[in-house]
């Protein structure tokens, strides 16, 4: 089940990626692309649950646009002016039936490290008390594995790579040697030179000064 980017990648690059993937799967004899969905639907982060519901239903109930192949579906979407980010949830079928749907007791691996756009779909699958939309099949028991812990409040999930405590970051090293440091960035990259650069720690080091310059709007 492929979630397409098109914002942090060229807007119509998914077709090439999907073709490469399908060729490799055909070579090794394992796997098929069973559905497509643009990130606008599958990886929303602003509680637009109506979008997430469309992507979820394509995975679970087979509702959505139908296509005979992923590459055909992408080309038709491009022809209709909808590039990767906005590809409507599409179910790949054979003889009129979905190739594969997510069902009870399946194992699912969510191949995404960044949590902000993975939380909503993960919650829709894992939260037995989910209220974002009505799940037509109810709560489905799964072995659902996230690449990292997208949100500690989401139950019934497993985490492949637990958060590591990073010791003696470069900022700590400078502070421990009595050096001053300035972290300077515009709004969009401020977190990168502070929180992320400090190994996921929000508080500044001793003599670490921060200056935020508003990004142009």
What are these regions (language model features)?
Residues 1-217:
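Feature captures the catalytic ectodomains and active-site-proximal regions of enzymes
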